């Protein structure tokens, strides 16, 4: 397809930018000697899983459906070797994940046990949930390589199921710990170390030694952060969980590492991972989510109407914050918009405040002229550009994407493009009000007008089949 043939709204994922991000992650993996996993909760566009699998060691899942998706779709012909788990510089050998019991692409492979092509390297499939259902545990043990427990009670409640797999060398078992050291400011909803958090085992709740069968530790405390918060958190882990680090064979440093952000200290991360490996003789995992598809996707939307309001024009779009980019309302935040000169309530209020002044001469513009400019979306004193409010066509009054200063007020039919829309969008969207989900488009890495591939178009049946 060509760009002008695309429907709106549509998520467009850029293959070239994905590769750029993945090259950075591959460098970290190779230089640091660690393993890197895709956290599917942020980005689950399985059309590009084979590409990602060429660079990363596997995936992490937050539930059985994500684990099954990885088992079915995250496969490769070539890529980093994963199985069995490496021998570490310690006397006790780690538990290996058996290829014979690895997940299968389809029923035919399952019937032909042990017949996987030599070139096909099975990626690792990790899963963590705060609590597991009894009815799902056996299937998880069949398709996953690593199983993480959030409490000692959960570990023991499911021991009768997972222990035979663990003793047979078919699965690795770990505990999620709570370092009780918060590095978040202003986003308690995303802070696993916030007071009252249900996530992770506190030091006071740990037994004297790691429970039988447990060979790994895991913590996840970061959210869109750099290297320093990771180092700070791990120092807390060293201080409070040192004896368990000595027993463990691997540690998973969790999600939230913005490794592919331009200002991230990649060399520092490589050095830090090497330090952990050397000091504690541990296999180290990182499981970034956003970093895989950071700035690798856009959301295009069309202007359907322009409503004049008392402060600025309000544009009604065919995209919705509530339905298509839920984090805009949940965090909240103002998503980047291509061609925007400024954005956000704070920037608007700041500019409005700077524009309040008294005429110095009778020849200067009076109140009427300034009011006319403001009503046109152009605050007093602003030399160029127009402020507009971008909103949706749902019935939710608060379904507002944000305030933006643009070179001019867009017209009905114009296309607007939001940036960084590959992450936490497709995995969280919904059909409230019967809103259609955006198309999913892959922009292939080639110089051609027809480089746009329509991966998925959603329609009425997709809406209806979620209901009863």
Q: Model segments located where?
A:
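A charged N-terminal "starter" segment
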Residues: 1-79, 84-103, 109-146, 152-164, ...
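Active-site beta-loop-alpha junctions enriched in small/polar residues
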Residues: 39-45, 64-65, 130-132, 150-152, ...
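Conserved, mostly hydrophobic/aromatic
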Residues: 18, 41, 70, 175, ...
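Active-site loop/helix belt of alpha/beta enzymes
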Residues: 163, 168, 179-310, 378-380
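Charged (often Lys/Glu-rich) extended helix/loop segments that serve as interaction or gating elements
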Residues: 272, 288-355, 373, 377-468
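Hydrophobic residues within beta-strands of alpha/beta enzymes
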Residues: 59-60, 147-148, 217, 251, ...
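Hydrophobic "anchor" residues on beta-strands that sit immediately upstream
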Residues: 37, 172, 250, 283, ...
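General structural feature for long, well-ordered alpha-helical segments within catalytic domains
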Residues: 21-24, 44-48, 55, 66, ...
